Design a protein with these regions (language model features):
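RNA-contacting regions in translation and RNA-metabolism proteins
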Residues: 1-223
Length: 223
């Protein structure tokens, strides 16, 4: 890549899959590393890192560059889909609407630059469980159980929401996990109920053994 006398390099792994780049094409890319060599500075570029998407939104959305809206996190499956978590510092401002723009113009401009990558704008929340619920969009979460020790959450959804929650090839759940930093397990409500019943049974058996009472009494104590 010619950068006015400075060498810029971009590997095929840093190009968005299936995008066609020809010689002399103008290209937007993120500077991910700069190295000093005997020939001078060498710049390594990427179009697949999260920061590429974040920088594009800063260019397209004035509220972000002005500091009114803050980007809290980003996660990408380059060229296919990504999620961006945002927060407004001014409660009067709608951060999602601002990032989408009039008739979707702002988010579409970013998508076009990223070879048609679909971008979900997510509302960041300081409550980790609520943040995960938001990140699972467009799927609707019915219930969520947090295990802070394991850094995981069990997410239950209606049966007709299960495919949407998982996404094609697990894309939605993987992006939500990357975005929030939590290990996420998604299941149907029926499976969640079965799992809860088994956990209660195990707890009851342990309590009955410890107290020397039968399972029925232990069950009453748990209730």
């Amino acid at each position: 890549v010619d950068m006015g006398g400075i060498d810029g390099m971009i590997s095929k792994y840093d190009l968005i899959p299936n995008e066609s780049i020809r010689k002399n094409d103008r290209l937007r890319a993120y500077i991910k590393e700069v190295k000093s060599t005997p020939r001078g500075a060498q710049i390594f570029l990427s179009r697949t890192v999260n920061d590429m998407m974040i920088e594009l939104f800063e260019m397209e959305v004035p509220e972000i560059s002005e500091g009114v809206i803050e980007i809290k996190a980003g996660a990408r499956d380059p060229g296919l889909r990504s999620k961006l978590a945002v927060k407004a510092k001014d409660k009067r401002i709608d951060p999602i609407g601002s990032c989408i723009g009039m008739r979707g113009a702002r988010v579409q401009a970013v998508s076009n630059e990223l070879n048609g990558e679909r971008v979900d704008i997510i509302l960041w929340d300081e409550d980790p469980a609520q943040f995960v619920i938001n990140a699972m969009a467009p799927a609707e979460v019915s219930s969520i159980v947090v295990d802070e020790e394991k850094g995981s959450m069990d997410i239950a959804v209606e049966e007709d929401q299960l495919a949407l929650a998982i996404g094609r090839g697990g894309q939605n759940i993987k992006l939500a996990s990357k975005l929030t930093g939590w290990k996420l397990n998604v299941m149907s409500l029926a499976d969640a109920d079965d799992m809860q019943a088994k956990e209660l049974q195990k707890t009851g058996e342990k309590l009955a053994e410890k107290l020397g009472v039968d399972a029925e009494v232990a069950g009453v104590l748990i209730d």
